[in-house]
């Protein structure tokens, strides 16, 4: 049963990325809680997801989740996935929920999802490039494999009147704009300036926002260079350079997406 007062919203259980930021918890790393059209799910439960959720002032109950989505197996995105499966299923006493994850998070010599927990779930779905999926009232796709170590996907979610994209870790490539165009776009931007890392930096994010023209862009998953530059200042400068509304995620921040919903399908 979905709560009657649910609105379209997202809550950032963390806004940090990169190894030093996560290891020192300079910014939290718990992922993103989504509620779209009454369907609640968690994306990328990194270290501290369960603690951040249960301590949140936003009344987040893991037993109300319908699913967990992993963009990839790296610990800053999947470190708390097993704890969250336990919490979602009440320690395995209620078999429920769906886990969506790339194949290398589930199989091979070093999977990040413990095998003994898998029977707690109703479904486990392996993500594929170009794949389309459903969870509750939400349709979503993994439009393209990202250019990052391992098997990495982003998500484009659609409910009636609203589309939301999450662009997970990747090096920049121009086709991202076409694949992830949406009303609201969340972009993982780790670096302030160009580097050899396979992560997006601010000038590339500016180019991407210009091409996509979302109604709202949210930058998150910050490394130290952006944190030192103050993410809210970086976001304001991006707004000025792109002509689009750009804001910076912060730990515990809730965004009401209802103002971005229109009358037609996403």
Predicted regions and their residues:
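Metallo-beta-lactamase
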Residues: 2-3, 94-152, 159-160, 252, ...
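Active-site metal-binding motif and surrounding structural segment of the metallo-beta-lactamase
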Residues: 48-98, 181-184
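Short beta->alpha connector loops
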Residues: 47-48, 105, 146-149, 168-173
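Short helix-capping segments at alpha-helix termini
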Residues: 90-94, 116-120, 239-245
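Conserved beta-strand hairpin/beta-sheet module of binuclear metal-dependent hydrolase folds
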Residues: 2-57, 151-168, 184
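Binuclear metal-ion centers of metallo-dependent hydrolases, dominated by the metallo-beta-lactamase
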Residues: 130, 175-184, 191-266
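Active-site neighborhood of phospho(di)ester-bond hydrolases with catalytic His/Asp-centered motifs
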Residues: 42-46, 66-76, 102, 164-170, ...
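Metal-dependent catalytic neighborhoods of phosphoester/phosphodiester hydrolases
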Residues: 79-88, 112, 227-236
